[in-house]
Structure formats: C-alpha cells, structure tokens
C-alpha cells in the first residue's frame, strides 16, 4: 500500500511538464499585471487616482454600470427562465440570436448600435421625438446592456438548470400559483447563481470599451468611463492617468472573480 502511494505521489515527466507550463503561465500573468501596477511611484499613482478626470470616470462608470446591470438582471431572469422551462417554436433560433452579441467583436456591436440609433428609421423617429441616444451618457448604458445581457442570461440560465423542476411542481400542488412557485421556490434556490451573474455582468459593464466608444464617443469629462479614460490618456501620452484607471479596472475584475468563485459554484459564464 505504501509502495502504491509513493508511485502515485511521485511526479512523472507527464505531470511535471503540465505543472511547469501552468506555473510559467501563472508567473507570466502575475508579472504583466504587477509590472503595470508597480510602474508609477506610489505618490504618482495616488495623485493620478485622485485627479478630477479619474474621479469623474470612476463616478460615471459606477453609475452607468449599475443601471445597465439592473436592466440586465430585469431582462435576463424571465428570458433565462423561459429558455430553461418552456418549449416554443423557434427556441433554437431565439437562443442563437440572444447569444449573438457574445460572438461579435465589441466594435462590431458598437457599429450596429450606432446605425440603429443613428441614421436608421428607429434613430430618426427617436430624434424627432426629442430622444437623442448617440454620444450621450444614455448611450453608455445602452452599449453596456447590449453587450453584457447575454452573459447575464447564460449565467442565470445555468443557475435555473441546476434546479429540479419537481420543486416547482410540488409547490403548485400545495396551492402556489406559477408566480408564487417561481418567487418562493425557484428564485431563492437560484440566488447564488444570480449573485454571481450580477457581479460578473457589473464587472464586464464597467470594463466595456469598444461598443461604448462607438455609440457614446470619447469625450473627456462627459462620456469618459474608466476604459475610455485609459484610451484618452494613452492617446495623449498621459501614462500615469492611464495606469491609474487600469489599476482600478484590475481591482474591480479581481474582486468580481473572487465573488464569482465564492457564489458561482456550478455556474457557467460561457
């Protein structure tokens, strides 16, 4: 028995090779991120983090991402539930369409949104009604929502798929309506998945760049979210401000992933 234990615990060339590749990748990623964070001196980083431009970008990013994430979860919950529990004509096609933004480069999504709210019939009617979307703060929310709602739908759907439909059936036999069974049984059981999806969607909304750039533009202190701040400051050679915005985005991504690992057990992003 001891001999068998030693045989299984002794590293082989196979396992050593795979572990070496994994370690090399980990070291590379840590070195890249650490190099960015440690590049400016601490006083320079603090000064950049507290500059009026970066503070504006933080505030705008938090507000727009909160709104777009709220919209995502409001839409994603019923859509994900319908895709999980109901059968209807064209369900496969609907699934493809809902997930299409996941396969599109964000810049392509931005172009599509720009045309839709710009020269198209919809955009013309909206402008005639006094509603202008393009190059406004509203455009940031719209772009974040369009790109990220498929992620929320997929994560929420994954959470619903782990729940046995029998629980809802039992609740109905005990007198619950469909809505009551959903609210009292399904939603509580899906809470962890919903929290994980909310956090990841919020993080991705804050980090959205391509679609936001094309639909909302890149105007300093107007439509300047954190990713736009990185873009603008790199373009003008203000490296410290770009790094400051990047550090904030890295921190948000790190916290979001930790929360997802905590609450997203068994939940898929893609």
Language model: regions and residue ranges:
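Short, charged juxtamembrane terminal tails flanking transmembrane helices
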Residues: 2, 263-270
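Membrane-water interface segments at the C-terminal ends of transmembrane alpha-helices
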Residues: 9-42, 52-161, 185, 189-210, ...
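Short coil/turn motifs that cap or connect alpha-helices
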Residues: 89, 176-178
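Helix-turn-helix DNA-binding elements, focusing on the entry/boundary residues of the two helices
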Residues: 167
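The alpha-helix within a helix-turn-helix
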Residues: 171
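Glycine/proline-centered hinge or cleavage motifs at structural transition points of membrane proteins
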Residues: 174-175, 188
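Glycine-rich helix-loop "coupling/hinge" segments at transmembrane-helix boundaries
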Residues: 211-237
